[in-house]
């Protein structure tokens, strides 16, 4: 029996409001995170991912408060990320009601933090978020590099090798965003999604670029992802989660 593939709406939250940009810029307001999360829960989303994109020191308490409000009203798994740097940050988020915590930049600067987090809390609640950009030229073997700081800073790290290293340290899941595709609405980068999904034994969540329901199905069928994440197609009412599930089921994908 094939494992059901998950559909995960993503809330990018800036100072307590859900926003959506293109390639991490041109941000527009999409509403109150708790209201939006509740709507997705009612629609039958499998999980919700909440990424605090301000993640500044002053934004921390707002975030914990929002997570508490969300967890009290939403009864599907909640992954929270953004500015997670210490074991205490993870503990605070789990105590506030997060089911999983996503580590991004901190993993690049201190890979051992991922191992420490997995030992403390178990791999099942540690997600490593990877922002990858294609760096190979025409005619070269495809290669993707990890970028940090919202896609602004190159790290020199190969995305596939890095993902394998994170799995080895105890990450339970990889949240893979294509920086080239983010907000462009012309589909996931299926090359990097497939390369990383095929290299790992843990689930990979495809993110960045969904513009229609076909793209969600492609992430699973062609990208070999375990789950697909989308924001703007759901936030702005173009499609609903039930429509996405019905479409994927028609394509022969097992959904919950």
Swiss-Prot record:
Q: Which family does this protein fall into?
A: Belongs to the HisA/HisF family.
InterPro entries the UniProt entry points to: Aldolase_TIM, His_biosynth, HisF, IGPS_HisA/HisF, RibuloseP-bd_barrel
Instruction: Summarize the subunit comment.
Output: Heterodimer of HisH and HisF.
Reported EC number(s) for this entry are 4.3.2.10
CC terms in the record's Gene Ontology section? cytoplasm
**Principal location class:** cytoplasm
The protein's name in its UniProt record: Imidazole glycerol phosphate synthase subunit HisF
As for what it does, the entry says: IGPS catalyzes the conversion of PRFAR and glutamine to IGP, AICAR and glutamate. The HisF subunit catalyzes the cyclization activity that produces IGP and AICAR from PRFAR using the ammonia provided by the HisH subunit.
Q: Which reaction does it catalyse?
A: 5-[(5-phospho-1-deoxy-D-ribulos-1-ylimino)methylamino]-1-(5-phospho-beta-D-ribosyl)imidazole-4-carboxamide + L-glutamine = D-erythro-1-(imidazol-4-yl)glycerol 3-phosphate + 5-amino-1-(5-phospho-beta-D-ribosyl)imidazole-4-carboxamide + L-glutamate + H(+)
Q: Which residues are catalytic?
A: 12, 131
Gene name linked to the record: hisF
Q: To which pathway does this protein belong?
A: Amino-acid biosynthesis; L-histidine biosynthesis; L-histidine from 5-phospho-alpha-D-ribose 1-diphosphate: step 5/9
A GO molecular-function annotation: lyase activity
GO BP field:
L-histidine biosynthetic process
> Where is this protein localized, as stated in its record?
Cytoplasm
Per the UniProt entry, what species is this protein from, by scientific name? Pseudomonas fluorescens (strain ATCC BAA-477 / NRRL B-23932 / Pf-5)
Top-level taxon: Bacteria
Keywords of this entry: Amino-acid biosynthesis, Cytoplasm, Histidine biosynthesis, Lyase
């Amino acid at each position: 029996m094939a494992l059901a593939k998950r559909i995960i709406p993503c809330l990018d939250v800036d100072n307590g409001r859900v926003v959506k940009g293109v390639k991490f810029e041109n941000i527009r307001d999409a509403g109150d995170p708790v209201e939006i999360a509740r709507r997705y829960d009612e629609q039958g989303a499998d999980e919700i991912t909440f990424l605090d994109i301000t993640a500044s020191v002053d934004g921390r308490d707002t975030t914990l408060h929002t997570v508490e409000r969300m967890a009290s009203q939403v009864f599907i798994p909640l992954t929270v990320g953004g500015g997670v740097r210490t074991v205490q940050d993870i503990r605070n988020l789990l105590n506030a009601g997060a089911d999983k915590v996503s580590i991004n930049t901190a993993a690049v600067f201190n890979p051992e933090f991922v191992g420490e987090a997995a030992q403390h809390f178990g791999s099942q609640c540690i997600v490593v978020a990877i922002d990858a950009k294609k760096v190979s030229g025409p005619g070269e073997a495809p290669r993707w590099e990890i970028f940090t700081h919202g896609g602004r800073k190159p790290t020199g790290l190969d995305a596939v090798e890095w993902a394998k290293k994170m799995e080895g340290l105890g990450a339970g899941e990889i949240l893979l965003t294509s920086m080239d595709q983010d907000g462009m609405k012309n589909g996931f980068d299926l090359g990097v999604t497939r390369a990383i999904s095929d290299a790992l034994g843990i689930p990979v969540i495809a993110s960045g670029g969904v513009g229609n329901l076909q793209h969600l199905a492609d992430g699973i069928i062609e990208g070999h992802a375990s789950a697909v994440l989308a924001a703007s197609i759901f936030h702005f009412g173009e499609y609903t989660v039930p429509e996405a599930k019905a479409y994927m089921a028609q394509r022969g994908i097992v959904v919950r």
